[in-house]
Amino acid sequence: MFYDKYLRISKEKNSIININLDPALPKQRTDNTIPDKYYSKDIRETLLNFSLDIIEQVSDYCCSIKPNTQYYLGHTEILEKIVKKVHDEGMLAILDHKLSDIGASNGSALYWIKKMNFDAFTFSPFAGNTKRTVEKAHDNNLGVIVLTLMSNPEAEKMMVNTSVNGEPYYLYTAKTVKKTKADGCVVGLTCFVEDEYIKKIQHTTGDKVIFLLQGIGPQGGQANKIRNVQYPLVSLGRAVIYSDDPKRTVKKYQDILKKYCSKERLD
């Protein structure tokens, strides 16, 4: 089970940190792009050079690596090499895919995710089919982490202010996570995500559910909110991978997180 892998590696690495891999090219955005030193004439080599170096630099202080599909479209061979490097460094590999489709299409995605040897992936429940996807994923030894209350400001409109069966959408989703036995929730730590929301999600999902926590860094997420979570996995992205010294930066964040995590989780 993904939960067991998380516990083992978190203990081995003494870490609850996940690193997001979002390797942006200059034409994709104006700031936070791959530094010049990684560039090659071949875009594939550029993406791979950057990704592998970041993985190696942060590996001492991280539990997992989460490449975002949107930055690797058309490059499954790169993702396979990334996963191998992640596993070689003793970490978990999570595909940030936000899968959301009908059963047959989801099944096709699971085939490729498994073939690339990922340990888990993110799933968007908006289209439904959560139960079937979780069952099929577990049959393939894949973990499913469900978008529950995301960190971006627009998420408040859909996930907090929108109701399903008389309750906030995020709480409805948390109940779905418990009912379907999904492995985790994606939950934000940004300003609109109140402590009470996180407590409600934790209470609803129950034990053995991993919280992939987002928003610390440029989004202004609050690290102290992880105190409300039993099994946190804190995502860091731009603040680390585009820093001058990713290894030193991720170590700094680890020291910060230790203040808000139980001694048993981070000693």
Which ranges hold each PLM region?
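Active-site-adjacent beta->alpha loops and helix N-cap segments on the catalytic face
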Residues: 71-85, 102-108, 125-142, 190-204, ...
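Short, well-ordered coil/turn segments that N-cap beta-strands
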Residues: 13-17, 60-63, 89-92, 118-119, ...
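C-terminal helical cap(s) of enzyme catalytic domains, especially alpha/beta-barrels
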Residues: 224-231, 235-267
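Conserved alpha/beta-domain cores
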Residues: 47-54, 58-66, 187-199, 213, ...
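Conserved N-terminal beta1-alpha1 strand-loop-helix module at the mouth
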Residues: 1-81, 85-88, 92, 165, ...
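Conserved, mostly hydrophobic/aromatic
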Residues: 19, 65, 96, 121, ...
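Conserved anion-binding
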Residues: 24-39, 101-189, 208
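A C-terminal functional module that forms or caps the active site or interfaces directly
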Residues: 185, 190-235, 239-240
